[in-house]
Amino acid sequence: MQGTWMVLLALILGTFGELAMALQCYTCANPVSASNCVTTTHCHINETMCKTTLYSLEIVFPFLGDSTVTKSCASKCEPSDVDGIGQTRPVSCCNSDLCNVDGAPSLGSPGGLLLALALFLLLGVLL
């Protein structure tokens, strides 16, 4: 019986382990208002960056409007130069879960760690 539980646990960890370790980013393929880009996506394992491209910088100056952006998972991301005044489509990159909430790096979500902890606690109770 104990062997069956170990196999079951291995299958669960194998299935959800990649999702727990995969990066999560906000994604919107077409330019939308930044406040409306709220879809979250589990990125492919080779996509280790969240990328945000700002499309309508001129309409938010002097920071009264809502910017238009695209957001995605990316395997490569080259951020814009911070001194690049006048760039038409600035790009920002980050590498923690849901860090591209505003197009700037932020603290990530500990969801994967919590899932792993819950599974190990469940294993301890079952055995």
Swiss-Prot record:
GO cellular component terms, A-Z: plasma membrane; side of membrane
Residue positions bearing lipid (GPI-anchor amidated serine): 106
Annotated propeptide span(s): 107-127
Membrane topology: Lipid-anchor; GPI-anchor
Glycosylation sites: 46
Major localization listed first in the record, in broad terms: membrane
Listed InterPro entries: Ly-6/neurotoxin-like_GPI-ap (IPR051110), LY6_UPA_recep-like (IPR016054), Snake_toxin-like_sf (IPR045860), Toxin/TOLIP (IPR035076)
Subcellular location: Cell membrane
Keywords assigned by UniProt, alphabetized: Cell membrane, Glycoprotein, GPI-anchor, Lipoprotein, Membrane, Signal
Signal peptide: 1-22
Occurrences of domain UPAR/Ly6 (ranges): 25-100
Keyword Nucleus on entry: no
Protein name: Ly6/PLAUR domain-containing protein 2
Organism placement in taxonomy: Eukaryota, Metazoa, Chordata, Craniata, Vertebrata
Gene: Lypd2
